[in-house]
Amino acid sequence: RGAYGNSTNDVRNDYYFYSKGNVIYTGAGHSSISNADEIQLFVNAIVAAANVTAVKPEVSFVKSLNPSAEVENIRYYMTDQKLWTNTDQNTLEKDMDFYINVKDYNMVSADLNQDDLDKQEITMQFYIEDDKGEVQDGSGTNQRLLDITRQIQNITEYGGNESGINVSNDGMFHTRKNNAFGFSVKNIEDYLHNSSNNDYKSSCKIYAKISSTVYLYNVPKKQTVWTSIDLKQRQLFDLD
């Protein structure tokens, strides 16, 4: 509107505003700003440049509690019997430990003022494929996923204190750090049991849902990503 609506796309003599990826080009600010339209254009450029800094975090399952650890996409679990029995533990591991590495570049952005930096955070939730669960929007799968965040109760942090991070009343883990985190799924056999066939699932995925909220000029911007690790069965054979 106004000067913007009258632009003839002449970047030499008129206003312009152009974006490519996370780079904003504008015709204001190259010389002294002398009128309200130029001030508005310059402010809009600053706001737009700040908005594109709200990027999605990068998350992956890894093999150990270390930000430099190798990515882990598949974990094999061992059973010593083909069929499920109610009296014996058939998986060799009662509990299974997992690790995720979270890289959120919003957490280290130099473009944000201190008030915005103080309010930003990362939340974590964990799910496992289970018929008792529900399909989750954004997860990238049509499988039913059961929220096991509260059952996990506590996660450990690379270089953090021994007490770790407890699940909050909202059913999520909260942090403000890029880091590697570890958690344990108790009684993993309960989720690996295929009740319909009285045997074990050949594949069962665990999902991590990571949401990053960053404030840009006091306006929250939320980005959510999902990642998973696939648990696949291997069976020990009785050689006697």
What do the PLM-derived regions correspond to, one by one?
Residues 133-153:
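Surface-exposed loop/edge segments in extracytoplasmic proteins
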Residues 115-122:
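Short coil-to-beta strand junction motifs in C2/discoidin
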Residues 194-218:
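Short, aromatic- and glycine-rich surface loops/edge beta-strands on solvent-exposed regions
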Residues 8-13, 18-115:
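Extracellular ligand-binding/catalytic regions of CAZymes and related secreted enzymes
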Residues 156-189:
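Aromatic sugar-binding surface patches on proteins
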Residues 1-6:
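Acidic, glycine-rich loop-and-strand cores that form catalytic or ligand-binding grooves
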Residues 124-130:
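Conserved aromatic beta-strand anchor motif in extracellular beta-sandwich/beta-rich domains
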Residues 218-240:
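Short beta-strand elements
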